[in-house]
Amino acid sequence: MELLNIKNLDLAGKKVFIRCDFNVPMDEFGNISDDRRIRSAVSTINYCLDQECAVILASHLGRPEGEVVDKYSLIPIARRIQHLLRREVDLASDVVGEDALKRASELKSGQVLMLENLRYEAGETKNDKELSKKLASMADFYINDAFGVSHRAHASVEGITHFFDDKHKAAGFLLQKEIDFLGKIIQNPVRPFAAIVGGSKVSGKLEALINLLPRVDKVLIGGGMAFTFLKKLGYDIGASLVEDDLLEEAGRIMDEAKKLGVKFYLPVDVVVADKFSEDAISKIVSYQEIPPLWMGLDIGPATVRLYGEVLSDVQTVLWNGPMGVYEMDKFARGSNKIAHFVADSYATTIVGGGDTADLVQRIGVDDEMTFISTGGGASLELLEGKILPGVASLIRKKG
């Protein structure tokens, strides 16, 4: 799909609102542990500054649920952006309050203003029209460079676009790059095409799994979500994470895979622990022998070998979601091994999702991946063939 191009806008000396995705992982001390998403936005910001624009940056961080929560403040983000841009970044104390509106109206060419966390406003996730209008009133132009949230119909992503005509809005360089690359994979993936899907819950990836099945040849399941599938097959999963309300859906996914001839793999062994802790007692067991009150926190070595074999002949790999609780060293081995399998393959490799991107960076194989998407849910929805809400109004109209 062809998007409205930032280079076709007459930005010189104007005020530009850039929706970025600075929802980056933070450590327990409030430090940024992976600034990839921040660095990815710099080219669009610098392009606007080169046009002598006054730049307003907006993002969310975490899920403050419409309230001001200090730990979700964008103070560390503004500090990091300031370092990357090598110029002062002014942080407003609110989103569309008196302070933000005053600073936005007084912003001069070459200056950068960052609004506080968009999700401090309850209307952001509700796609509130009044909030969209207030955000739009701050600038002459709107740029969406937040691929990671473009699957959300939120005020700063979708609602705001209705207050700008096609000559005053466009995709940023990062959004364009993501759409272009993933679009090629959708249209013509080199086969066999495997999807590795992990993470804690089926619920967040249920629809994506259903819609991906007709497009892929193999699906490899890991992470906490595997136990919902195993329970549906009748196995005792102890105290492992399970979504009982989705057991029927899990069954439907497996039935659909069988019908389509898609090979659907589940773990054959797991690393279980007596509690969710780094100092837990752990052991490796078959998926048929998970003890009562123990929980599965990683895939086991037999599963790692099986998945390595399954991936040995694939030509395209989409990986979304870790294989276990990779944040704890004791339960990171499965994810780390799969990361090395993917990195060492000759396949086109696409990594999607913040946790998976964080994982491959932690173990130093990020440069071996063909493409690391800044969006997890967004990349899955795009690969399903959906038009993302944040992209829909940025598509160039024919004729």
From Swiss-Prot:
It is found in: Cytoplasm. It catalyses: (2R)-3-phosphoglycerate + ATP = (2R)-3-phospho-glyceroyl phosphate + ADP. Keywords: ATP-binding, Cytoplasm, Glycolysis, Kinase, Nucleotide-binding, Transferase. ATP binds at K205, G296, E327, G353, G354, D355, T356. GO terms for biological process: gluconeogenesis; glycolytic process. It is an enzyme of class 2 (transferase). One of its GO terms (molecular function) is ADP binding. Substrate binds at D21, F22, N23, R37, H60, L61, G62, R63, R119, R152. The keyword Transport does not apply. One of its GO terms (cellular component) is cytosol. CDD domains: Phosphoglycerate_kinase. Pathway: Carbohydrate degradation; glycolysis; pyruvate from D-glyceraldehyde 3-phosphate: step 2/5. Gene3D superfamilies: Phosphoglycerate kinase, N-terminal domain (3.40.50.1260). Pfam families: PGK. Its EC number is 2.7.2.3. Belongs to the phosphoglycerate kinase family. HAMAP family: Phosphoglyc_kinase (MF_00145). Monomer. This is Phosphoglycerate kinase. The lineage of its organism: Bacteria, Pseudomonadati, Campylobacterota, Epsilonproteobacteria, Campylobacterales.
